[in-house]
């Protein structure tokens, strides 16, 4: 029935092939009257197994079109279809079948036979509609042959295919069938599950129709649209695709023919799969594409990625969002500052969108990011969908990189290949990383410093024990380069080599103490080894740069990354207190850190820190905040053996292999005669080698089989399985057997003061003071052992108690001991006191009657717990296994020592009750003695868990349990499933109460139980839910395993999460080369969201080096409900939006967003842990867990909750419909300040241009992030307080100066009123400043009411800058005189009096009288400009403002200029120099003599009745957010009523009465501006700008910015606009530090400084010593030197303003001037100079500006040299030569002396 139809028999097909254009897909549908028809895939494009038979098609047609060829025959027929995977056959009535691509993706495709004249009811007509009738696309046609009438009649019965036709030709000629309207347009839309498949056609099953919405594949024709048409990347004609809805996720696939292998290698030739959100065509696109395509893709990035011509065929398929969401998205940013608040907002905008690799995303039309990586299920994919759970990581290609190179003794060593470590770094590492930066075109700013720790002791460090540090050390830091652009990488490498060669001479060479030969140098000290180096000190040193979150920002760089280069292997001995301090500090900083080791990786876990606690115990730990990489640039050879241990001494011996063999002969093993089998021998050998000596001494024949010795057998059995979990400082395996024996004996038997310690530390009893001289028990003596340690109760050990070492100092205090321990003097002990080891005679009374003695180590000792309800005696055979091969102080500690951890606030009774109520059963089986102590006892290191626990808990939660390992075969099926299932395992983690002692409990402690020994399930879950603490109450943080196998989980027993804050991970077995089973536990908790799931970290190392990540905005960590209630203090406050903010369109949603935004800026992260839902559901009142959000999207209509965490502080922000935002702050309780435990740290630093090392001005260890008053900050955001009223400003600040630059040639002339005006350079720059101020004024924030009023008022009145030359105080005195004479009596406001207006028809005499004597008269004053004085003149800009304010028919400045020119032509006024026409600017004009009114004959116009209020307004004018302060004249006011108390310090020498009369002069103006005038941002972007109102053109003009939650990129754009305005007028906008130069060393120790001493001291040199001159200006010669060298005055010293003869006090809008020294800026902006009191000049590079202008990438072959760079070194070198050259400096001073003698005047 389905016979093959050969193409040679299809004459009609061949005849039609010539009429078909060169199409890749031809679908032939055969309609037969006598039977069904099938289809054969002829593959014309995508089926590689079938050849293309349409090579000779018509060239006039377009490719990629689909045509359905319907062949009509009276018998059996066969059609062909291309691009079909499951070509489904739709069987119609009368046996006619349409063979093609049916819209179905189900596997249930069955042939349905239809009888009658209609479709089977089970088939949805929409199925056919989607497949054929309702699609848009290319102008395709249907070719019909044979009986056209039959075809017409049959097709008319299928309305979903075609409903009407314009024309059907009769006969057997092919007929072109076209639809009459678009709604029934037949196109080439196909449905397929896989277009690449060659499956035969199948029919549609009615059961499969239900699943067609998601899984169907649609074949569409592609067109492109421009971005001006639509910004959407992909659009669909959804009117013709009814099963796809707006906003639905779809998949787009491309399939293309692979012609060659080279084509496969081309990325553009590969098939692609992308995801997009379905958006409907807009009307323009629908009209344009209705005949050409169904899908439109935006031109640009996506078009280049697809690499398909128009009208190509693509396949789309609807997808489920939850199945397609990406795990992690990486966004790269460059040359911009994106803070974490904007990252949160950007992430919110990206949710529910699709991205593809390489996509450039624009945010606010300013922030450009590039999608660099999309990860899903451990794989990097091309495209992905972003949902709420997708982690979005921001990586910066323009970061500040800090390279800290450890200069240790090993830096001069050679590696195994013979290369010196330093040369390996300089010749391999740095060139490689510079090439990486060049390839990806990064713009990093680089700082490189050497960190050296000099050992000044006389003994060798080899004499120190592991964990001990060198006491007598001195730390040095050499700053090689500081914030240098990568474009200078050649100079950087030269500096590195040079400084390394000089470091030895500088630090090892010291001047001899011999007075006879002072020039003799001796070598003192030596470089410390890397293992004893200052690793934590240098980390704190690097962290000082980002301690202040509100430091002055570099608007072109994002994130700070520290890379520590070390010659070691990642093992360091550190101080315990300093480790705690560093961990606490790093938890609150946004600092990434990498450790790059130049050696080969060792065979132990790294990085590894060793420290000794307060009990002199050695610990190993992993700092998870430190990433480690081992640099090896050589290709790996698996067949070559590489040494992994330090064999440097052996390599340098020069011995040959023969000599080594002769000298290093080893004896053969002498096997024992009693070996029965190999397994026994290996078992005994391992036991003797690896187990403690005491446990290995047990012999089988010493253990009898009587019932009393069952416990001994059990002990022997357990000892065989025990593994050592604490390694000693020296590896046991490297010692000989005799050495190990001696070591163990020394560690086991050691007498201390008042102590008697049993040989085997597993058996420790409490011994009376009288028996201290008795010999220790001999465990080989069975009778003695049975007598003293006969077991009466066996226990199941389930926990380990970890002491809190930080409390030991308090507990060893005699006063404390006497208070809390019952002291007896008799030597006899009775009862149960024999088994407790007492350290001193005063501890003779039993503290705990029956301490639990079994200790848990390794896989733990498995015994049974049998509760003795009536037995209160101490178990004489209490076993205390050792923790490992440590020191005797660690291994032999009694239960009494454990009690030293009790704080002063608790008693012994309460202490023991807290312990036993946590772990022991409170049922009848758990008995307590008269003191309230449970009969089950505790030891130093173990607490036992009863089999019967009722779950009662106490409120003291001081420990956390960390799951460890499970022994093979010891886990039941249910428990094994929990352990192997990560989600299940995590779900059972429950918090339990914690006593005051830190406790370690392994997971294997619980899971090693047999079926009849299981602990109560609730207790077990509790144990698995918490972890150990070290010095404070901590959170619960669930561990995550990367492997679910039993072996990997079992290895986990060697690791313990030491602190639930994830400070570090304590290692009990350090000899583990791989720790992959720890998984995410080794990742920093705060940075865990940076790493993709299931991706090896080694693949991410170059990302960390080249594009470091910013701190993620989310983290999955949160304390349990119990911990939140008991370990945290609650502080709360409420915030409500100020109603005045509504006039600026600020809502409560804006306030909430700003509150979250601000917390993200200072380091908070949004908590996404599932624990939050449990905590929230347990709250009283509102328990809506669905109100917990991660992003703030949409309208704020319902309840909104968000949890944020930083360090030890949690914030809960809750908004309800009342409009109030409630803030709950949970602050972790802390009884110990770690910063008080570490002494001050002194180090020495030598910056780039220093000649000697100097003491640092900052203590990097004690420098920490300050705490914030969040109530105050939230109120500031709500608009209730003025931030300037507080002493300490919390916000961002930046300072800019305007310096002269080269003037463009076309700027010197300008046409005004038809006249060509030629301006001087000074006039051009002054005009540029006016234009800049006008641009700033246009950004002023206006309320809604002000915006409406300004439409009807004068809007072009601008605040003017008062320019002056000469002395500032002379100028201010003139201004004050004018104020006192009441000549300035008009209201200085942009809103003038609209009731009294003049017009242009006014008579000149009347106008002259209004100008001079009117109510709002013009300011006519005497002005001085460069040695010339001009009496009774006014400024052109003031005249323009006066005309606009007072004339009703003048509204614009241009109209005012034209009218002013008319008045000047009429002779009303003239230019003082008769040089210019009337200009709007700082040009002086005078009233013509014939219009001047004699002031002496006119009565004062300022009467008490009319102008009192105006004068009061003028005198009280402030410059902060005041329209009255926006204009000239200079504001002066009484100080007493408005200024703060601090300003009283400015005039201490004046009397109280005269002080009250002083006026306050404000020299700057402030204005609240909107940096987003185009309203592209999602929030109000506000900023306060301060600019000078008084300016000397020979000085710097200042602009200061202050903001809190404004987007930095918008500020950068605004500054760019201002910079372009300045460049047009020969000015340059330069950013400089906000604070004065002398304060920077105490903030940034990396900053480079130069202190210059003048070779000529003008105060002492007879040639220049002039008392008259120095009485006027002490620093006259110094100032002249700076001016001649190109420096301009920036800030005067504060003492300059504190003049006794001044009648006013000078203030600025940004605060009181408090500069200690005068500061100058070089005209290049590269250097800042400060003049010291002793005459020295202090120089520093302007790094904030240098990093902005020198941001070009590393010069590569394809890129030319940067067009503009500033070389700061040239400036300092030239100036230094002048200062140190007698001839050059004398010439400068002689020129200054000549000027003084000529005019005897000194300018400021």
Swiss-Prot record:
Keywords: Membrane, Vacuole. Residues 1-65, 169-204, 723-797, 866-892, 1501-1528 are annotated as: Disordered. SUPFAM superfamilies: Winged helix' DNA-binding domain. Residues 14-27, 779-789, 879-892 have a biased composition (Basic and acidic residues). SMART domains: DEP (SM00049). Pfam families: DEP, DEPDC5_CTD, IML1. One of its GO terms (biological process) is regulation of autophagosome assembly. Its main location: membrane. It is found in: Vacuole membrane. Residues 1503-1516 have a biased composition (Low complexity). Residues 1-13, 185-204, 723-749, 866-878 have a biased composition (Polar residues). PANTHER family: DEP DOMAIN CONTAINING PROTEIN 5, GATOR COMPLEX PROTEIN DEPDC5. Belongs to the IML1 family. This is Vacuolar membrane-associated protein IML1. It comes from Candida glabrata (strain ATCC 2001 / BCRC 20586 / JCM 3761 / NBRC 0622 / NRRL Y-65 / CBS 138). The gene is IML1.
């Amino acid at each position: 029935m389905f016979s093959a139809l050969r193409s040679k028999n299809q004459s009609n097909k061949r005849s039609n092939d010539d009429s078909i254009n060169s199409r890749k897909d031809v679908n032939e549908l055969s309609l037969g009257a006598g039977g069904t028809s099938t289809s054969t895939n002829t593959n014309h494009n995508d089926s590689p197994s079938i050849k293309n038979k349409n090579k000779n098609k018509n060239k006039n047609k377009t490719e990629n079109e689909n045509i359905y060829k319907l062949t009509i025959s009276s018998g059996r027929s066969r059609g062909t279809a291309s691009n079909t995977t499951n070509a489904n056959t739709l069987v119609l009535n009368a046996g006619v079948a349409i063979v093609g691509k049916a819209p179905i993706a189900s596997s249930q495709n069955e042939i349905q036979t239809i009888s009658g004249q209609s479709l089977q009811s089970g088939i949805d007509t929409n199925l056919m509609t989607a497949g054929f009738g309702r699609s848009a696309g290319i102008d395709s046609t249907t070719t019909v042959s044979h009986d056209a009438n039959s075809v017409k009649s049959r097709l008319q019965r299928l309305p979903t295919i075609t409903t009407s036709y314009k024309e059907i030709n009769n006969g057997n000629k092919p007929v072109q069938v076209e639809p009459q309207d678009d709604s029934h347009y037949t196109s080439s839309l196909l449905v397929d599950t896989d277009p690449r498949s060659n499956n035969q056609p199948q029919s549609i099953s009615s059961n499969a129709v239900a699943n067609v919405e998601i899984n169907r594949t649609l074949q569409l024709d592609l067109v492109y649209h421009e971005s001006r048409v639509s910004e959407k990347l992909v659009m669909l004609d959804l009117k013709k695709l009814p099963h796809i809805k707006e906003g639905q996720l779809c998949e787009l696939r491309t399939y293309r023919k692979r012609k060659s292998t080279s084509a496969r290698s081309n990325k553009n030739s590969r098939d692609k799969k992308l995801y997009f959100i379905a958006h409907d065509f807009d009307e323009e696109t629908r009209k344009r594409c209705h005949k050409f395509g169904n899908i439109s893709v935006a031109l640009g990035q996506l078009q280049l990625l697809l690499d398909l011509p128009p009208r190509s065929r693509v396949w789309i398929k609807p997808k489920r969002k939850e199945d397609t969401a990406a795990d992690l998205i990486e966004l790269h940013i460059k040359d911009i500052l994106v803070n974490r608040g904007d990252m949160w907002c950007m992430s919110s905008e990206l949710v529910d969108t699709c991205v593809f690799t390489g996509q450039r995303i624009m945010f606010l039309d300013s922030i450009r990011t590039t999608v660099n990586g999309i990860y899903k299920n451990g794989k990097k994919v091309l495209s992905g969908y972003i949902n709420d759970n997708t982690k979005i990581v921001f990586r910066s290609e323009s970061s500040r990189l800090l390279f800290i190179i450890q200069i240790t003794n090993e830096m001069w060593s050679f590696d195994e290949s013979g290369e010196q470590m330093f040369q390996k770094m300089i010749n391999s590492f740095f060139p490689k990383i510079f090439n990486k930066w060049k390839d990806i075109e990064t713009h990093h700013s680089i700082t490189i410093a050497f960190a050296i720790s000099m050992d000044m002791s006389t003994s060798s460090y080899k004499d120190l024990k592991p964990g001990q540090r060198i006491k007598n050390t001195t730390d040095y830091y050499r700053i090689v380069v500081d914030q240098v652009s990568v474009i200078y990488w050649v100079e950087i490498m030269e500096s590195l080599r040079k400084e390394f060669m000089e470091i030895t001479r500088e630090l090892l060479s010291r001047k001899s103490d011999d007075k006879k030969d002072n020039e003799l140098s001796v070598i003192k000290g030596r470089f410390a080894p890397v293992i004893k180096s200052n690793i934590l000190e240098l980390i704190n040193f690097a962290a000082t740069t980002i301690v202040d979150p509100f430091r002055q920002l570099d608007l072109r760089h994002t994130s700070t990354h520290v890379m520590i280069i070390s010659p070691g292997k990642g093992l360091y001995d550190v101080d315990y207190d300093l480790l705690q301090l560093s961990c606490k500090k790093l938890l609150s900083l946004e600092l990434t850190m990498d450790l790059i080791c130049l050696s080969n990786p060792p065979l132990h876990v790294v990085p590894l820190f060793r420290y000794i606690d307060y009990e002199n115990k050695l610990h190993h730990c992993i700092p998870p905040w430190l990433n480690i990489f081992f640099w090896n640039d050589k290709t790996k050879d698996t067949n070559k053996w590489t040494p992994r241990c330090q064999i440097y001494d052996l390599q340098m011996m020069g011995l040959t292999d023969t000599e080594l063999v002769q000298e290093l002969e080893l004896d053969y093993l002498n096997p024992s005669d009693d070996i029965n089998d190999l397994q026994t021998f290996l078992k005994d050998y391992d036991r003797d080698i690896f187990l403690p000596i005491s446990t290995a001494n047990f012999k089988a024949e010493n253990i009898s089989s009587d019932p009393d010795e069952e416990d001994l057998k059990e002990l022997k059995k357990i000892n065989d399985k025990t593994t050592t979990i604490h390694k000693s400082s020296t590896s046991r395996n490297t010692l000989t057997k005799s050495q190990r024996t001696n070591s163990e004996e020394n560690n086991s038997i050691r007498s201390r003061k008042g102590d008697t310690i049993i040989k085997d530390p597993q058996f420790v009893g409490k011994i009376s003071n009288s028996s201290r001289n008795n010999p220790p028990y001999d465990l080989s003596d069975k009778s003695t052992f049975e007598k003293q340690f006969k077991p009466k109760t066996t226990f199941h050990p389930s926990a380990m108690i970890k002491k809190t070492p930080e409390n030991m100092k308090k507990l060893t205090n005699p006063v404390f001991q006497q208070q809390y321990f019952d002291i007896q003097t008799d030597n006899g002990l009775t009862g149960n006191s024999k088994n407790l080891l007492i350290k001193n005679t005063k501890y003779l009374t039993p503290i705990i009657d029956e301490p639990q003695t079994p200790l848990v180590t390794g896989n733990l000792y498995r015994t049974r717990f049998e509760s003795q309800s009536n037995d209160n005696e101490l178990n004489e055979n209490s076993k205390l296994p050792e923790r490992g091969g440590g020191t005797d102080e660690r291994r032999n500690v009694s239960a009494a020592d454990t009690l030293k951890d009790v704080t002063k606030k608790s008693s012994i009774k309460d202490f023991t009750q807290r312990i036993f109520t946590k772990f022991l059963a409170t049922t009848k089986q758990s008995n307590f003695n008269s003191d309230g102590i449970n009969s089950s006892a505790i030891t130093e290191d173990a607490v036992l868990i009863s089999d019967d626990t009722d779950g009662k808990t106490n409120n003291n939660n001081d420990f956390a349990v960390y799951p460890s390992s499970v022994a093979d075969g010891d886990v039941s099926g249910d428990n094994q499933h929990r352990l192997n299932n990560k989600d299940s395992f995590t779900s059972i983690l429950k918090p339990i109460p914690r006593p005051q002692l830190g406790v370690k409990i392994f997971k294997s402690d619980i899971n090693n139980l047999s079926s009849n020994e299981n602990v109560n399930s609730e207790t077990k879950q509790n144990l698995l839910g918490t972890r150990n603490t070290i010095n404070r109450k901590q959170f619960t943080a669930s561990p995550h395993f990367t492997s679910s196998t039993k072996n990997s989980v079992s290895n986990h027993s060697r690791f313990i999460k030491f602190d639930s804050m994830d400070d570090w991970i304590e290692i009990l077995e350090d000899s583990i080369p791989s720790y992959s089973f720890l998984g995410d536990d080794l990742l920093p908790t705060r940075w865990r969201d940076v790493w993709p799931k299931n991706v090896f970290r080694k693949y991410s190392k170059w990302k960390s080096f080249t594009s470091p990540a910013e701190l993620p905005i989310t983290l999955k960590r949160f304390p349990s409900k119990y911990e939140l209630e008991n370990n945290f203090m609650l502080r709360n406050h409420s915030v409500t939006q100020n109603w005045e903010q509504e006039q600026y369109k600020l809502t409560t949603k804006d306030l909430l967003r700003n509150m979250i935004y601000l917390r993200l800026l200072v380091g908070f992260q949004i908590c996404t842990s599932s624990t939050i839902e449990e905590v929230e559901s347990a709250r009283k009142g509102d328990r809506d867990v669905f109100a917990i959000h991660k992003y703030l999207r949409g309208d704020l209509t319902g309840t909104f909750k968000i949890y944020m965490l930083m360090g030890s502080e949690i914030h809960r922000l809750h908004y309800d419909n009342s409009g109030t935002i409630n803030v709950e702050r949970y602050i972790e309780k802390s009884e110990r300040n770690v910063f008080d435990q570490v002494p001050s740290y002194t180090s020495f630093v030598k910056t780039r241009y220093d000649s000697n090392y100097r003491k640092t001005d900052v203590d990097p260890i004690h420098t920490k992030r300050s705490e914030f008053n969040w109530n105050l900050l939230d109120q500031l955001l709500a608009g209730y307080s003025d931030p300037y009223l507080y002493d300490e400003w919390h916000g961002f600040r930046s300072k800019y100066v305007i310096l002269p630059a080269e003037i463009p040639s076309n700027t010197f002339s300008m046409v005004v009123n038809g006249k060509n005006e030629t301006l001087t350079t000074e006039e051009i720059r002054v005009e540029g400043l006016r234009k800049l101020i006008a641009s700033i004024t246009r950004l002023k924030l206006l309320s809604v009411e002000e915006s409406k009023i300004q439409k009807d008022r004068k809007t072009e009145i601008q605040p003017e800058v008062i320019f002056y030359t000469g002395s500032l105080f002379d100028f201010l005195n003139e201004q004050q005189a004018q104020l006192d004479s009441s000549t300035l009596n008009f209201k200085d406001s942009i809103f003038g009096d609209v009731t009294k207006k003049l017009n242009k028809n006014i008579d000149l005499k009347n106008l002259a009288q209004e100008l001079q004597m009117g109510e709002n008269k013009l300011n006519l004053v005497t002005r001085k400009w460069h040695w010339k004085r001009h009496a009774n003149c006014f400024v052109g800009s003031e005249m323009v403002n006066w005309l606009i304010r007072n004339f009703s028919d003048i509204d614009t400045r241009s109209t005012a200029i034209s009218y002013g020119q008319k008045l000047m032509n009429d002779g009303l006024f003239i230019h003082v120099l008769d040089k210019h026409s009337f200009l709007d600017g700082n040009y002086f004009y005078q009233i013509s003599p014939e219009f001047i009114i004699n002031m002496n004959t006119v009565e004062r116009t300022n009467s008490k009745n009319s102008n009192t209020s105006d004068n009061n307004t003028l005198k009280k004018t402030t410059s902060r957010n005041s329209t009255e302060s926006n204009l000239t004249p200079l504001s002066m006011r009484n100080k007493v009523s408005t200024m703060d108390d601090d300003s009283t310090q400015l005039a201490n020498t004046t009397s109280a009465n005269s002080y009250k009369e002083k006026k306050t002069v404000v020299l700057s103006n402030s204005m609240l501006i909107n940096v987003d005038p185009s309203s592209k941002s999602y929030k109000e972007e506000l900023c306060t700008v301060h600019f000078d109102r008084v300016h000397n053109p020979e000085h710097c003009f200042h602009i200061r910015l202050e903001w809190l939650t404004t987007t930095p990129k918008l500020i950068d754009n605004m500054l760019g606009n201002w910079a372009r305005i300045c460049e047009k007028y020969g000015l340059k906008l330069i950013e400089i530090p906000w604070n004065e130069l002398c304060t920077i060393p105490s903030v940034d120790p990396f900053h480079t400084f130069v202190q210059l001493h003048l070779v000529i001291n003008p105060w002492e040199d007879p040639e220049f010593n002039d008392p008259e001159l120095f009485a006027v200006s002490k620093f006259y010669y110094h100032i002249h030197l700076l001016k001649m060298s190109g420096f301009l005055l920036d800030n005067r010293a504060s003492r300059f303003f504190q003049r006794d003869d001044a009648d006013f006090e000078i203030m600025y809008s940004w605060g009181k001037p408090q500069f200690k020294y005068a500061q100058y800026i070089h005209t290049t902006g590269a250097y800042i100079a400060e003049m010291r009191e002793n005459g020295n000049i202090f120089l520093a590079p302007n790094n904030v500006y240098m990093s902005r202008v020198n941001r070009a990438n590393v010069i590569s072959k394809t890129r030319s040299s940067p067009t503009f760079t500033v070389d700061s070194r040239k400036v300092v070198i030239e100036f230094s030569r002048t200062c140190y050259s007698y001839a050059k400096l004398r010439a400068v001073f002689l020129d200054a002396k000549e000027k003084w003698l000529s005019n005897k005047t000194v300018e400021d």
